[in-house]
Amino acid sequence: MKIVGIKRDSIFSPNSVEKDRMILQQVLDGLGDSIKMIDEKMLTSEENADVYVSMARHSKTLELLKEKENEGALVINSAYSVERCERGWLNEAMRIEGLPIPDSEGKEGYWLKRGDMSAQSKADVVYCKDRAALANQQASFVIRGVTNWIVQAHILGDLVKFYGVSGGFFRYYYPNDDGISKFGDEELNGEAHHYDFDVDALQAIAERVSMLTGVEVYGGDAIVTASGTFYIIDFNDWPSFSRCRNEASEAIIHYIKNKINS
C-alpha cells in the first residue's frame, strides 16, 4: 500500500503555508513511516500510489488526480470535490438546496468574493459599504482579469469558524477571541457576543455541504445573529485546523484508515 501526500501550493495558502504543511505532515506521520510529501506543482503522472492524501488546488494537479481516481486510486479530498468548492458553483448549489446563505441584497454593506477559486490574497474578498463601492470593486476585479464573482450581503453577528471531518468530527471557534486571522476581515463583525445558537444544527448543515461537494475534510465560516440564526458564508476543502490540529489529525487519520480498509 503506497501513500503519497500532496502539499498545497503556497499561492493557495495565504499567511498559512506552515500551518497547512503541519496538518498534512501530522496526518502522514499517523498513516505510516516515511510517507513522501510532494508539492502539488511537482506531481506527475509517473507518481503512482494507492492513496493520495491531497491538499491540492491547482487545476492541473486536480486534473491529474482525477485521472488517478478514475484508475482506482483513493484521493482524499477527491479532486472532483475540491472543484465543487469553487464559490460560484457552491453558492448557487447551496441556494438551490435551500441551505442558509446570505442574500445578495442587504442594508449593512456587501462582500464581493472571487468566484472561480479560493482567495489567494486580501483583494479576492472585499467588503463594500454600499452599491457604489461595490461597483468600484467589481471594476477593479475586471481590471485584474477576474470576471467570476459572487456578492453576499454583510450580516451583523458573531463570526464562527468551523472544522469538520466526515464521520462525526466537528469543532467551532470564534476567531475574534484568539486573534488568529488570514486577512483581518473578522474585525468588521467586532468582538464576539457569543450569541446562543444550535451547534448541532450548524454541524448538520456543514455535513450537508460536505455531502453536496463530496469534500470529506473541510472547514468554513458562519455568521450567527443575535436571534441565533446562522448563515454559511464560506466553505473550504481541508483547512489548516490550526485551532485543533492534534484532534483533527487523529480524526483524519482514522477516517482515511477506515476508507482504505473498507
Region spans (language model):
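A long amphipathic alpha-helix within ATP-dependent nucleotide-binding catalytic cores
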Residues: 181-232, 244, 251-262
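Phosphate-binding site of ATP-dependent enzymes
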Residues: 128-213
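A short linear hydrophobic-aromatic micro-motif
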Residues: 101, 147-151, 217-220
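Anionic group-transfer/hydrolysis microenvironments
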Residues: 115, 154-155, 163, 221-223, ...
